[in-house]
Amino acid sequence: MLKGQIISGEFGKIIARQKAGESIEIGELLVADSSEGKILLQVYDLVYGSQISQQNLEMISGMKLEENTEFELFDANLRNYMLAMMKSLVMVKGKNAFVSKSLPGFFSEIREIKENDLGFLTKPKNPLFVGNLRSGSKILDVPIYLDGGKVFSHHILIAGTTGR
């Protein structure tokens, strides 16, 4: 499902405009397809975007709040929108994942991740199940395993955030 389109950014801060009617969440995993493979992206921030100047937005808000005036915006979906800040996680080529060292193409479409995008995740010889992969608030049917032999002989930090 198409979620948006990349419009600008830099390495570590890729900016995409959200498609009207779609929802993007912090922590969501998205995919930008390219001629070289698939670039897996993770959303780390969301901000508002508008073609209307800040001064005019404040005036429209004041008119609605203070004088109960109704405003109809021409092409509201084109003028006001959400922007997603993303970072590149990996480049996937076939069943292999590589450190991403390039940006997705300008105006590349981004879509939600599917299970077949994650073929590079394999089950180790001595699997220790740690849970299913999350994308935003959704839990995907993709089990995540660590190598049990290495887990029990090393100290491991599993970091995560909650409450968002």
Residue ranges and their predicted role:
Residues M1-A159:
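Basic- and hydrophobic-enriched, low-structure N-terminal and domain-boundary segments
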Residues T162-R164:
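ATP-binding Walker
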